[in-house]
């Protein structure tokens, strides 16, 4: 992980993009805070999504949603994705270095984004944060309560599905990003993050 940190601190003209990959609750935000990359723009669709849910007066406790709230959530996510896509597009046009804070659960979409970024002159990295399913589910379960209702929690089925996709993508992402791939493990067994 130190290699990634040093590369990002280099003062070069080529913009850099870091694509984060990890299941919900893996600790991607925790890892970012530890790297202290506060000078690099962070793009996260969840920020827009949470704002949209609040504006629609929908509880962020998504794991206990009513059918009516799930419908509102879908509308909020659709709008968040549109706004987020524009944010990413504008950032790329401006040649700004940035961190894409998400799960990267879709291998196909990640490959497309990586290609688009490289065509735009970016050096592209992936920071993959692994956690076991138990931690992912526990973090999701506790997220809403621990935040005092200010952060969202997902339905367990969504966490499980995303965890499976992200975990299956580890080797393909390692092969795709080669030397620009860094992975760490964040598990319940101890509080220390380990390089994979």
List where the protein language model places each region.
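Proteolytic processing junctions in secreted/extracellular precursors
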Residues: 3-11
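Short hydrophobic/aromatic beta-strand immediately N-terminal to the Walker A/P-loop
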Residues: 17-19
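The conserved Walker
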Residues: 23-24
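Conserved lysine of the Walker
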Residues: 28
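Conserved phosphate-donor/acceptor-positioning beta-strand/loop module used by diverse small-molecule
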Residues: 118-140
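Conserved GTP-binding G-domain of TRAFAC-class P-loop NTPases and closely related GTPase folds
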Residues: 134-196
